[in-house]
Design a protein with these regions (language model features):
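Alpha/beta-hydrolase-fold enzymes
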Residues: 16-97
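Conserved small/polar residues in nucleotide/adenosyl-binding loops
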Residues: 177-184
Length: 188
């Protein structure tokens, strides 16, 4: 009776999916969540179309053959380093976290070489948030007002049903909010 889920960033979408599956969960909180299946299939702000997805599938499936022949998986790369001067603010914030003592870890995908390049194949054909309207327990969705990924949280919230759901937009907050949530529970 005391099981809850907290999901930050990409794990926010995973947390909502898990909450839709597991009826033992009594409360879910997601902070600066991403819908990883949506962003993989459609790109940021849903700019990719069917042709772009097909091209990505061709590229990634060709990479699978290369990986097999080489006996190892090519990596997509973690947070860009060195940081380009014209990087978007959220990339600068990620760099300031994952590439410094604040958030660097030897096993962190974002600090190092990232995911396998082909891992997107399993995400792009799935709809992770398909069953979230069936979540019956309390859900809190937190996002920064100026976060580049805010639309993921707002769109997910629109799909939730019941009066025990809340969308909390933090005034003035940008993408770093999710990074600070990794560091402290004060923001949660």
């Amino acid at each position: 009776e005391r099981i809850g889920i907290i999901g930050i960033c990409g794990w926010g979408g995973m947390a909502l999916n898990a909450a839709a599956i597991d009826t033992r969960v009594k409360a879910t909180v997601v902070s600066t969540m991403y819908d990883m299946t949506r962003v993989t299939a459609n790109g940021y702000f849903d700019v990719m179309d069917e042709n772009a997805r097909y091209e990505m599938r061709e590229e990634l499936n060709a990479q699978r053959i290369i990986d097999f022949k080489q006996g190892d998986y090519a990596r997509a790369g973690g947070v860009v380093d060195p940081l380009p001067e014209d990087a978007p603010q959220f990339v600068k914030d990620y760099h300031a976290y994952y590439k410094t003592d604040r958030g660097y870890h030897v096993r962190s995908l974002n600090s190092n070489d990232g995911w396998n390049r082909t891992s997107g194949l399993s995400l792009m054909n799935a709809k992770l948030l398909h069953y979230i309207p069936e979540i019956r327990h309390a859900v809190l969705v937190i996002h920064g007002e100026k976060a580049h990924s805010r639309y993921f949280g707002e769109d997910a919230f629109k799909e939730l049903k019941g009066d025990n759901k809340e969308l909390m937009i933090i005034p003035g907050a940008v993408s770093y909010t999710h990074l600070r949530a990794h560091e402290t529970t004060l923001h949660l």
